[in-house]
Amino acid sequence: MRDLELPKHGLQIVAIEGGTVFTRDGDYLASFRNYHAKKRELERFSVKDSESYSRYSRDILKQCRFIQPLLMRTAADPASFKFRDLSEMLYLLRKVNDLTASELADTVRFWTMSISDFLDEYFENDVIKASLAVSGIIGTALGPMSPGTAYVLLHHYMGEVDGSIGAWGYARGGMGAISKALTSSFRAMGGTLLNNSEVEKVDISGARVKGVILKNGDEYLAKNVVSNADVKRTFLKLTDPEHLPPNFVKKVNNFKIRGSSGKVNIALDSMPNFPVISDNNPCLKGDIHFTDSIERMERAYDDWKMGTWSRDPFLDMMIPLSLIHI
């Protein structure tokens, strides 16, 4: 956002103020951006868990501080002796060397454990654990008891809105506002945007990219071609595989891009009413979940693994109208 100056081109992000988990007994657990309000809400379900939340947040932020600088760097190839790869390996070793033996053990353990096991170390209430486990599985083809899902949690704690770490938000005006801001920024930098111009193939000659050829036959020359299509479409359909190393083509063919979730947009004639929550409660201006235990999440994942629709699916609902049109 900063590099492209998207706020200058009209993009405004409205921070999500909270979230909700509805339970099968008619109750709900609210979540708030405000730390103290969140702890008070946790007390309704477990005083012990409310007290543990501070330790949980501290440990999560500790892991975030370690991994965040690494995310913007290109991972090293451990089998390569190229200077860049050796430099990256040395950088990682220095980061690891800064940790104590205990911190290193905790970090390695955290990266490999499930979100279910991780939450068990802090909390006892099923609803509280279910509300926090969502950040370990959403957008993945994994269940809360799958190894590695604790690490996924970090990506949801490293979000940022206007300098507020851990915050998430909506684009005011909907997703189209992001496209408009990107278009405006691109054109301001001298770019030309072509609509309804499907690419037929990437033109390659003499082992070098020349440009792209459109479906209508038009050709655009370029020294560099950047693709936002998926890896298989880019290298197996838009690019003739004969121009690529056979081993690379094999790896692309084996790359898994199976979807793990579906999205349904529903137009309503009015705002939905939740009898147990007041309409102005900020917890409704965020994620709304209906799965109140980790066990139910895992059972939904079991059905997906068997190639069938989940009989009791994990549902994540949002009402963006309550937030973006302000």
Model-derived features: positions:
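Conserved N-terminal glycine-rich FAD pyrophosphate-binding loop of Rossmann-like flavoproteins
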Residues: 1
